Regions:
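Gram-negative outer-membrane beta-barrel domains
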Residues: 2-251
Length: 251
């Protein structure tokens, strides 16, 4: 009986040794690390579309009164600020080559609900008034961002354009009498924009963002006909700031 027990123990030891040797080879340290760290998902990569709304503030308008068309450098300059709501929509594409790096392009179209009007300081009550009426605006921008989990901190910049109406109502009193002049310029003006934002991916395909943009438009001129052959010229230089929130859906 004891011999049978010894045989059983010996047989079990041999079998255990055999299966241990025949099992899978242990992973090296490097292989263990690689298997323990799966590749992080590219949460931000792909196309997206969304809406936005916010506020435009400190839209600074510098008006240069150049007097007659060929009078040379500006003789009087004044400024005024405007503000108002903005709303629109955006579409874009993100590429995420690294887990922490996001590169993208974005375009958006919106409306600037801003109106500004001011009288030239020092002019009589019925003197010179400058007015701006922005409307539809658009941007085409690049984006570069730092991603951490479902958060994205990014910088952005590119082209900015807006339908910008500028008006001058001028009443000049001189030795020849009272001269009334009106002029306007309603063009789609181009410039540049820079800014940044923070975006939060709160569900699989949905994200919320807060974004700031500074924009600067090229200078524009309004000619005001006076007398029969004379013209007053007024130069406009406009820039401003936009803060807006947005909601995006990523495909």
């Amino acid at each position: 009986m004891k011999a049978l027990a010894r045989f059983a123990v010996l047989s079990g030891s041999v079998a255990l040794t055999f299966f241990t040797m025949a099992g899978p080879e242990p992973l090296s340290v490097n292989e263990s690390k690689n298997e323990a760290k799966p590749e992080e998902p590219r949460l931000w990569q792909g196309f997206y579309i969304g809406i936005n709304a916010g506020y435009a503030f400190d839209l600074d308008t510098d008006v240069s009164d150049l007097d007659f068309l060929n009078a040379g450098p500006p003789v009087r300059t004044f400024s005024f600020d405007s503000d108002g709501p903005v709303a629109g929509g955006q579409v874009g594409f993100n590429l995420q080559p690294l887990s922490w790096l996001v590169l993208g392009i974005e375009g958006d179209v919106g409306y600037l609900g801003v109106h500004g009007r001011a009288r030239q300081p020092g002019s009589p009550p019925a003197g010179t008034f400058a007015e701006i009426n922005p409307g539809v605006y658009a941007t085409a921008r690049g984006r570069i961002g730092w991603a951490h989990d479902n958060w994205l901190l990014y910088a952005t910049g590119g082209w900015f354009g807006s339908d910008y109406e500028r008006r001058i109502d001028d009443t000049t009193i001189c030795s020849c009498g009272t001269v009334l002049g009106k002029g306007s310029n309603d063009d789609f003006e181009s410039g540049y924009t820079v800014g940044g934002g923070l975006e939060w991916l709160f569900r699989d395909h949905w994200s919320l963002r807060i974004e700031y943009l500074y924009f600067n438009l090229e200078n524009s001129t309004v000619n005001v006909p006076v007398f029969q052959s004379g013209t007053f010229r007024f130069g406009f230089d406009d820039d401003g700031h936009i803060v807006r929130g947005g909601l995006n859906f990523k495909f």
